[in-house]
C-alpha cells in the first residue's frame, strides 16, 4: 500500500464526519504511521503510543563493571544493582486549522476528490510541523509554536554535550569534535549512531569529500551517495535550518546551523491516539473549515548520549 493509499484509508472523510471527527483506533494508527514515515529524524525515533496526556517510560541499566574473579568456596561479597530511572513524556496540543472555499470545489480540475487531495496535503504538512517542533522546540522562544515544548536541540544544549564551533565553517573537524564529545560507553552500539545535519551542511561536507581526486570523491559530486564520517552516516534533515542568526565575537552571522550526534534508539516521540479531524461550514464566507488536533511529545531516553555542535557557518 502506498503512502497516499494509507492516508486515504486513515482519513475517509465520510467516516470522520459520522464519528464526530474523532479517528477510530485503526485510523489513528494508520495516520500516526503516515506522520512518522513522512518525517526524517522523527522516523528514526522510537515512537511511544499514549492513551493519556502524560506517560512515564522506565529505564534500566548497569552503569559499571559487575563481574569479579571467581574463587571456589568464597562469596565475592559484591553485588551490583541495576539502575532504575524514568523518562516523562508530557504532550502538548496542536491544532492545524485550514479552509477551502466553495469556488475551489466548483472550479477545480481534480473533481470530487479535491477535498481528499487537500486534506492529504495538510496531513503531509503536519508531519513536517511535528518534526520542526521535535527538533527546534524551545520554551524560551518568541515563536508561539516553538515555545510549546523543549525539543531535541534544546535538550542537547542543556543536558547533553555541547561543542561550540564559534562561527567556523563546515569541516570534518566539526564531526570529529562531536565524536570526541560523546562518552565512550555510547560508542558500543556504533552502527546505531547518526549525525543529523541540515541540507546545506551536507552539501558543504560533500563538496569537501568531492575535492579528492579519486573515484571515491567523484561519487559525492555525481550521485546521491550518503556521506559518512568515521563510518557514521550523515542524515539530511530538511527542517534543520541553515539561517540561524547570532553575533559571535562582534561579528554578525546569518548562516548558522547545528549538528546532532546520537544513537537512533535514543530519540523518543510520543503521540496521543485521540486524534481528531473536524469539519464545519461558514455559509457567509462560503468556505468549508477544518481542524486537525493532535497531542505530541519528544525526549531523549538518555540525554548524556547526545552531542551537539552549534554555531557552524555554512558559507565560511
Question: What is each stretch, according to the model?
Answer:
Residues 2-39, 44-54, 150-170, 177, ...:
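Sequence/fold signature of self-assembling virion shell proteins
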Residues 16, 40, 127-136, 188-192, ...:
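Intrinsically disordered or highly flexible coil/loop and linker segments, enriched in small
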Residues 18-99:
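Assembly/oligomerization interface modules of large self-assembling protein complexes
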Residues 66-67, 108, 131, 204-206, ...:
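Short helix/loop capping segments that flank catalytic or ligand/cofactor-binding pockets
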Residues 95, 192, 287:
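Extracellular structured ligand-interaction cores
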Residues 102-181, 311-316:
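Alpha-helical scaffold segments that mediate packing/assembly in large oligomeric complexes
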Residues 177-212:
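Ordered core of a single globular domain
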Amino acid at each position: 500500500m502506498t503512502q497516499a493509499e494509507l492516508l486515504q484509508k486513515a482519513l475517509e472523510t465520510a467516516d470522520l464526519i459520522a464519528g464526530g471527527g474523532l479517528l477510530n483506533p485503526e485510523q489513528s494508527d494508520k495516520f500516526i504511521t503516515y506522520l512518522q514515515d513522512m518525517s526524517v529524524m522523527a522516523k528514526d525515533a522510537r515512537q511511544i503510543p499514549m492513551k493519556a496526556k502524560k506517560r512515564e517510560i522506565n529505564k534500566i541499566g548497569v552503569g559499571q563493571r559487575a563481574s569479579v574473579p571467581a574463587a571456589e568456596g568464597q562469596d565475592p561479597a559484591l553485588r551490583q544493582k541495576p539502575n532504575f530511572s524514568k523518562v516523562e513524556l508530557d504532550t502538548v496540543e496542536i491544532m492545524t486549522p485550514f479552509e477551502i472555499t466553495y469556488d475551489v470545489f466548483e472550479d477545480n480540475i481534480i473533481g470530487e476528490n479535491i477535498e481528499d487531495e487537500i486534506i492529504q496535503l495538510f496531513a503531509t504538512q503536519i508531519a513536517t510541523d511535528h518534526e520542526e517542533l521535535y527538533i527546534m522546540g524551545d520554551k524560551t522562544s518568541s515563536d508561539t509554536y516553538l515555545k510549546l515544548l523543549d525539543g531535541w536541540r534544546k535538550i542537547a544544549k542543556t543536558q547533553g554535550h555541547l561543542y561550540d564551533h564559534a562561527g567556523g565553517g563546515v569541516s570534518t573537524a566539526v564531526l570529529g569534535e562531536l565524536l570526541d564529545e560523546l562518552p565512550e560507553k555510547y560508542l558500543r552500539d556504533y552502527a546505531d549512531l547518526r549525525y543529523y545535519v541540515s541540507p546545506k551542511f551536507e552539501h558543504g561536507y560533500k563538496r569537501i569529500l568531492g575535492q579528492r581526486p579519486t573515484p571515491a570523491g567523484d561519487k559525492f559530486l555525481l550521485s546521491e551517495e550518503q556521506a559518512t564520517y568515521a563510518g557514521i552516516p550523515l542524515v539530511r534533515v530538511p527542517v534543520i535550518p541553515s539561517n540561524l542568526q547570532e553575533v559571535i565575537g562582534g561579528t554578525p552571522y546569518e548562516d548558522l546551523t547545528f549538528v546532532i550526534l546520537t544513537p537512533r534508539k535514543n530519540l523518543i516521540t510520543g503521540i496521543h491516539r485521540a486524534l481528531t479531524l473536524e469539519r464545519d461550514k461558514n455559509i457567509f464566507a462560503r468556505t468549508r473549515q477544518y481542524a486537525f488536533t493532535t497531542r505530541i511529545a519528544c525526549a531523549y531516553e538518555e540525554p548524556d548520549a547526545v552531542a551537539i555542535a552549534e554555531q557552524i557557518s555554512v558559507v565560511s
